[in-house]
Amino acid sequence: MTIKRLTTSTGERIAIVAGLRTPFAKQATAFHGVPAVDLGKIVVNELLQKHDVDPGIIDQLVFGQVVQMPEAPNIAREIVLGTGMNTRTDAYSVSRACATSFQSTVNVAESIMAGHVDVGIAGGADSSSVAPIGVSKKLARTLVDLTKARSLGQRLSLLSRLGLKDLLPVSPAVAEYSTGISMGQTAEQMAKTYQISRQDQDALAHRSHTLATKSWQEGKLAGEVMTVHAEPYKSFIDRDNCFRENSVLESYAKLKPVFDRKHGTVTAATSTPLTDGGAAILLMREGRAKELGYKPLGYIRSFGFAAIDVWQDMLMGPSYATPIALQRAGMNLADLDLIEMHEAFAAQALANMKMFGSTKFAQEQLGRDKAIGDIDMDKFNVMGGSLAYGHPFAATGARLITQTLNELNRRGGGVGLTTACAAGGLGAAMIVETD
């Protein structure tokens, strides 16, 4: 198989110079009241400071958030304006659900490949603690009509049509817009479709927490997770607060299913918690990085995105996106040294892992003769996954990329796959490598 790499027209690779993230915090804990735009400003500002980057060399910033704040629809531009960067720095926002920072990274990489920019920042941030609370459709329409009313009588007439239920706040939807099916219900679908047992789900969650705890204890994450002093500045957080330091496998069996209480197997412990956090990546043209004296963490070798139907098992995106990225890289699964898969739910991760090794799935769904390949668990999520770290939707992709490259470097180099499912039946995969 021919080895292929993502390069500019002059043959220069796309370098990932550095990556950084905030600690990931459970909803309504350390970052309670801190909006995503501020989390984005915090992490980008620290990335620049930590790596002594002159803000003037940043040509482009692409950032994203999934839970949109109406008052700051272009989070990327707000980050530029709020961090002392050059106000002429190009900035725009993207959203690809849970694969958002994969998308922002690819957008910057493509700009470098095209020769439009030399240096860019990509990333994402989300806050489940500062969510946009809406109003009912009837109240929203009435409020618009009130602005057009010309008399007190007209206003009173409009208000009289509202009932008490019309005045109640509307929380952000947790279900797919097109189907009304929640992520948890989809995880239950997948557990049933692919025969993922409750015991296996519990075991994966326990493994994730155990490995994340070990990684923190060994200091592996200290260099890629910053300390944050958040408002009201009475305390600080310097590590994730989602993982369970004393995870005991037997304790998982005591929990009841939450999405299908009668026949289900997915519990709160085998689902990622609602999380706040931000993450950013500094990318450069390979030659520019050398000119500036930076030693890159690694390089983007290839990437792939995929989309599938949303009505059934829509979190199978990694199984569709991964073969695209592998083919573009000229690689097989066995060639990889590390595999990092977003664990939205234990059932989702296990279903994808199972289908990676299924010839039937490859032939019927992917149009391939052979399976993607069986996953070697010694390579899989070796530092734990999203079940332990948490999942600020737009930040997870950047976490996966940075964490994988740092671990590859600790192991002496190599090639790693990062992949994630996303709402809307989307999937993302990116292959990264070190020198």
From Swiss-Prot:
Catalyzes the final step of fatty acid oxidation in which acetyl-CoA is released and the CoA ester of a fatty acid two carbons shorter is formed. This is 3-ketoacyl-CoA thiolase. Keywords: Acyltransferase, Cytoplasm, Fatty acid metabolism, Lipid degradation, Lipid metabolism, Transferase. CDD domains: thiolase. It is found in: Cytoplasm. PROSITE patterns: THIOLASE_2, THIOLASE_3. Pathway: Lipid metabolism; fatty acid beta-oxidation. Belongs to the thiolase-like superfamily. Thiolase family. It comes from the Bacteria. It comes from Colwellia psychrerythraea (strain 34H / ATCC BAA-681) (Vibrio psychroerythus). GO terms for cellular component: cytosol. Its EC number is 2.3.1.16. The keyword Acyltransferase applies. The active site is at 98 (acyl-thioester intermediate), 391 (proton acceptor), 421 (proton acceptor). SUPFAM superfamilies: Thiolase-like. GO terms for molecular function: acetyl-CoA C-acyltransferase activity. InterPro entries: Ac-CoA_C-AcTrfase_FadI, Thiolase, Thiolase-like, Thiolase_AS, Thiolase_C, Thiolase_CS, Thiolase_N. PANTHER family: ACETYL-COA ACETYLTRANSFERASE, CYTOSOLIC, ACETYL-COA C-ACYLTRANSFERASE. HAMAP family: FadI. It is an enzyme of class 2 (transferase). Heterotetramer of two alpha chains (FadJ) and two beta chains (FadI). It catalyses: an acyl-CoA + acetyl-CoA = a 3-oxoacyl-CoA + CoA.
